[in-house]
Amino acid sequence: MYGLLMALAMLFMAGLCACSAQSSAAETAPQTIVVGIDVFDPYSYLDRNGQFAGIDVGLATEAFSRLGYTPEFRTISWPDKDNLLSDGTINCIWSCFSMNGRETKYQWAGPYMYSRQVVAVRADSDIQSLSDLAGKRIGVQATTKAESLFLGEISSLLPEVKQVNSFETTEDMFAALRKGYVDAVAGHEALVAKLTNLDESSYRVLAESPYSSELGVAFAKDTHEDLAVQLTQTLEDMKQDGTIGRVAEKFGLDAEKTVWGEQGK
């Protein structure tokens, strides 16, 4: 009888230990957070193996890992982003999303870097600064921030140019620059860098940026307040320890200006 009681006691204790181990594992397992992204190379895109890649994908993976989360990336229809946030289909938007003008619309984490518009010219051009663009022919990609800037739809200190030529693709835009149909081209730094890096001896990017905006991670307004604060601090840590700069540089961006802005650190 005593032996039977001992055996039952041991089985009971083993069961308690197993439950405790399972509970502990559940508590330490990373939580999943659903991140909505747009396809915008080099910030967020699918690589040749069909895996999510890019600046924001790398930063989100690292930042959430430091906080004990595993990000689940989900491509979204950009016009539907607010509805997807509000109904909980996604937990946040992390996809080269500008905070400027939207400061009170979302619960933000960040800013974590700057998104810059830049101007590129031919290597032998006499254009050295933005002021030299006065009276020049400018090439831009249609429906982009650069087009709005040079058409005067966004306030800036740009001089009055002679002509704004809008092209369907950045490749067409650079072809026009190469052939001399335009004097300069403007666009997002990442897209311009991708093409100028293919032939560095033929092009030059002006040091001045005509426009920059702060990028952040957007949660639905009045939600995830604690997580947004924690993520903001983690992103600041990643700026300070050089993580964000290294990722930006890997994709051809000016690490100093991308992380710290035009004035630098």
Each predicted region: which residue ranges?
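Short coil/turn segments
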Residues: V39-F40, R48-Q51, F97-M99, R122-D126, ...
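C-terminal motif of bacterial Sec signal peptides marking the signal peptidase cleavage site
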Residues: G15-A18
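Extended ligand-binding regions for polar small-molecule ligands
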Residues: V57-R66, I127, S131-R137, A142-K145, ...
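Ligand-binding cleft/hinge of the Venus flytrap
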Residues: L46, A60-Y69, A146-F167, T196-E200, ...
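Acidic, polar ligand-binding/catalytic clefts
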Residues: T61, T70-D132, R204-S209
